Structures are given as structure tokens and as C-alpha cells.
Amino acid sequence: MDYHSPYFFGYLLGMIHLLGIVAALHALFTVRTAQGAIAWAMPLLFIPYLTLIPYLIFGARSFYAYIKARRQANQEMHVAMANLNWRPWVEEALTARESESYAALRAMPKLGRMPCLANNQVKLLINGKATFDAIFAAIEKARDVVLVQFFIIHDDTLGKALQQLLLRKAAEGVQVFVLYDRVGSHALPASYSQMLRDGGVQIHAFATRRGWFNRFQVNFRNHRKIVVVDGLLGFIGGHNVGDEYLGEHPQLSPWRDTHVQISGPVLACLQESFAEDWYWATRQLPPLILPDTYPDNGVLCQALASGPADPQETCSLFFLEAIHSATRRVWITSPYFIPDEAVFAALRLAVLRGVDVRVLIPSRPDHRIVYAASSLFAFEAVRAGVRMFRYQPGFLHQKVVLVDDDVSAIGSANLDNRSFRLNFEITLLTVDRGFADQVEHMLHEDFEHAREITAEDTQDTHRLQQLGMRIARLISPIL
């Protein structure tokens, strides 16, 4: 072929556009939502030379193959668990169903793959110092097994402190298992993991890649944050392991986040969620520990694990059910506000029902494109009657939902398409008036440090900013 021919580049561009048409048709048939299909198809048709390779990396080509593989691994894991006679929650599940509070969860117990359980104890952990002080203190007392899972682990001061603590516990004979997301922790040096392995800690990266093509598939990420110590004490929430979560990032400080400390039968569900991810990464089961007895009182809890391999879109349906169930209020905090059409419609309908709908988002960006898309959605929400607030002191990263007077949810799930359909997430649902009062008090303080977005703000935005927001929203389904 004559590469210097005047026709060569014409043929090449024609071939690229033809491939773009094929890829656009593929997106229309395989992407799960209309918004996502359009967000891929239009750029593939008009600028394929810029979007073909990103579509191969982030698109839907291997989605269904991955779903099949993940479900098969989960099935194998549960067969292995059945041999352990792992049925720890029968009595607590029956007690939960007999409780008057159970009705407040409505569809949640059937939506999640794990039951609502009674007799749990929960403690709110506000911001990084309280969270990591509690986690480190729990690990310090470990005698048998420590399970640690984070989306991001940094090799900084906090990361090194965790590393040294885990090495010390492993040297004492404690079995330590660490799981991190390969994409989220892309900056973690191999030496960090190797030092842990050399010290007896079992550490693995969670990756969705299987086979030659799937090595390019980086769009599914494990966003869960789980710590379980000896089957007795657990932690989930929004924090990852890094100095910025302690407020050490100058541009984002002070960092605002929330975790929750848990004890009781629901820890079996946290262990099962960890076991699924560990089994996918290693094809082995970690040790699972159950206490001999549980307290006879406590609060109703349900661990809601969600991910792209679920039979239905668990995370987005959770937000829909939470909003639809609200009769008095629904308050949501999320670092990103990119609702799909169904969730946005649910928010508007809640306003029309007279529900106090509030959403708290950051005033500072950590991802500028996502921030721009969130801003446009926020302006549209304000016009629909939703009260939108921007947290002023620093970056807001917490993921909290408060419904009426009893139901609260704290976990890793953001109010965006990535959490709805691409990430593995975990959230703790709690039905308890006393704990909900604590969450309400915490959120009241956050709102006091926030500025409400007004209709005037939506009008004062420069036209170039509006254009940028609309472009960001166009690609928001694939962010």
C-alpha cells in the first residue's frame, strides 16, 4: 500500500468513520440506558477518531461477558460457603420481620441480596480522625482475623501507619486480608504490597479484567470500604486510606466525610460482601467468623451491597425507593449529583408531595467535569423546588441519606451513574429513631455550614460556563 498516496488518508478517515458507525450501532444495542447509549453513539458518529479507543476501554463490549463471569464466581463462592453451614442470621431476621420498624424499609429487604437483621449496635463516626482512630483501635485488639477493603490506599503517612499496624498484627499470628481496587489505587507502589506480603499479610488487587481484551476494561471499580475485626466489630462509609481524608490536602481541606461503626449480626453480611470480592480476586474464601451469641436488643440494620453484576440495578433502585417512601423529608449528601431521569423525577415528585427535599453537595471540585455536570443538575433541581446546598468549609465526600424520622443510610454510594451502574458499592441501612436523630443533628450542622443555591445563581452563570456544564452533562452517563 502506498502510504504517500493522496488517497490514503481519505481511505483511512473513511474506515475510521465506518468503524465509528459500527461502534455507535453496538452502543445502541448494548448500553443499558438510553442516555448512555446516546452519549456514546453521537460522538462515535461525528468524532470517531477521538472516541473509538475510549469506547473500547470504557464501553459495553465486555460488559455482559464480565457479568456472566462475576455471577459464576459468586455462585461458586456461595456453594463453598454452604459447605461451612453459613446461616448465621435466621433468628435475627425473624426478629426483624416481627418489628414494627420493619415496614419502614418497604422494598429494601427484597431489593438487597442480604436480609434485614435485628439486635445491632451502631456508632456514627464523623470525619477522618474519629474514623481512623476507631479503626486502628479495633485492629490493635484483633486476635483472629482482620478483613480490610478500600477503593483507594495511598502510600502516605496514613497508609504507612495502616501498613505497619497490619504487619504487627500479622507477626502476632492474626490472619490479615487486604483488598484494594486496582484503578482507585493505581498510584500505590508495588513495594507497599510486597512489604505486606513479606510480613504475612494476604493482599490482592480487585480487578474486573479477565482474558486478553478485558485487560483494557477498567470501567468497573470496587468502591466499597469495609473493615471487619474478628467478626465482632465492623466499619463502612465514605473514607479511603490517604492523608487527604484526614484533611491534609490543602485545596480540599477540611475534608468532610462520615463512617459508621457496627457490631452485631449484620457483620455477617459485611463479611459475605468481602468474601465475594475476595473470591473473585483469588478464587479462595477468607475465614468467616461468627460470635457465639448476640445481644438481645439493638437496632435494625441491612447491608445493601450493589454492583454491575446484580440481577437488577440495586443502587439506583435504592435511591428511588428511599425518595418515593419519604412522607416528611429526604435529605441526601453526595460529592457528586448526577441523577438519572428516574431519580431526578422521583425528587421532583417528592417536592410536589410536600416532602422536604434537600441535597448537599461540595463547593469545591475534585473532578472538574463531574463538578460541572453536577452544577447543571443542581440548577435544574432548584428550578424544580429541590433545596440544593453547597458545603463551604472544605470538600464534602460523605454519602448519607436520611428518610423521615427513622431510616438512614451511610455507605460508599454516590448519587451518580457510576455508583448506580458501574461500581461495586455497599451501604448500611438503619431503622432506628435514636440513630436517625444523631444523623439529623450531624446534617443540621452541615447545612449550617452550607450556602443554599438560589434561582438567581442559576441565572448569573456565564454563558461559557453554561456551555461547559451542558457538554459535561452530555457525557455524564459515562463519567
Curated annotation (Swiss-Prot):
Q: Keyword set for this entry?
A: Cell inner membrane, Cell membrane, Lipid biosynthesis, Lipid metabolism, Membrane, Phospholipid biosynthesis, Phospholipid metabolism, Repeat, Transferase, Transmembrane, Transmembrane helix
Which Gene Ontology cellular component terms are annotated?
A: plasma membrane
Q: Which GO terms describe its molecular function?
A: cardiolipin synthase activity
Give the PLD phosphodiesterase domain ranges.
218-245, 392-419
Task: Give a Pfam family name.
Answer: PLDc_2
Q: Which residues cross the membrane?
A: 8-28, 38-58
Instruction: Output the superkingdom of the source species.
Output: Bacteria
Q: Give the way it sits in the membrane.
A: Multi-pass membrane protein
Main subcellular location of this protein, as a coarse class? membrane
Kindly identify the residues recorded as the active site: 223, 225, 230, 397, 399, 404
Record-linked PANTHER family: CARDIOLIPIN SYNTHASE, PHOSPHOLIPASE D
Q: Which family does it belong to?
A: Belongs to the phospholipase D family. Cardiolipin synthase subfamily. ClsA sub-subfamily.
* Described function: Catalyzes the reversible phosphatidyl group transfer from one phosphatidylglycerol molecule to another to form cardiolipin (CL) (diphosphatidylglycerol) and glycerol.
The name under which this protein is listed is Cardiolipin synthase A
